[in-house]
Amino acid sequence: MKSKLRVLRAERGWSQADLAERLTVSRQAINAIETGKYTPSLQLAFKVARLFAMPIETIFSDEDEL
């Protein structure tokens, strides 16, 4: 799964640790999502979408999507 998490985080000047704290997850989880090694749960995806005030599909997309 592709994500725009790294870009959105960087635009706000947040470190991985900052974002992890806001989402109550580990920094390692943020790193794994950003590198595509981990697909977030639906619950976490909704938390991310609320935090950035964007639809989930704007932040996350299937790698096979064109």
Regions found by a protein language model. Name each.
Residues 25-38:
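Recognition helix of helix-turn-helix/homeodomain-like DNA-binding domains
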